[in-house]
């Protein structure tokens, strides 16, 4: 296979038996109508979805609209728009719910559980709360505030 650009390489990979059509196999490129109901915001390059699990109030997922498998492959305009989205999201979540700060992560590990991985850039956003959040009379606590969200550590 001769390719002078990465784009040509990906085109060739998509045509091969090994690669299959990457976009057709990508869960983010083929998001179900059921999951699209969580849409919060849509920009030129990114889509913001409310996470279906609200273990952290305001938890969202920001998804790149085009198929792209790694952060270094982002274009300058995509980086700039992501930066502006981060600023806008944090201001909103701090104003509306009084979040102390937000954890941002781009974890691509689950894609590689498949024999034919098909990673797609998406960013997980977990607002963190020092104080209780009250919504419609219900109180939500961030019992792990000050600790990594996956530590399972809770304060008494």
Regions found by a protein language model. Name each.
Residues 2-156:
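HIT superfamily nucleotide-processing domains
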């Amino acid at each position: 296979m001769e390719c002078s650009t990465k784009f040509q390489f990906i085109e060739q990979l998509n045509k091969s038996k090994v690669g299959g059509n990457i976009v057709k196999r990508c869960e983010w490129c083929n998001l179900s109508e059921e999951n699209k109901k969580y849409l919060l915001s849509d920009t030129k390059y990114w889509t913001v979805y409310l996470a279906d699990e609200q273990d952290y109030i305001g938890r969202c997922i920001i998804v790149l609209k085009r198929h792209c498998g790694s952060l270094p492959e982002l274009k300058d305009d995509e980086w700039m728009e992501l930066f502006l989205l981060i600023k806008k999201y944090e201001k909103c979540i701090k104003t509306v719910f009084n979040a102390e700060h937000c954890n941002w992560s781009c974890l691509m590990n689950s894609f590689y559980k498949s024999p034919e991985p098909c990673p797609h850039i998406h960013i997980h956003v977990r607002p963190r709360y020092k104080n209780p959040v009250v919504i419609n009379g219900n109180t939500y606590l961030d019992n792990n505030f000050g600790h990594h969200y996956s530590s399972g550590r809770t304060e008494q």
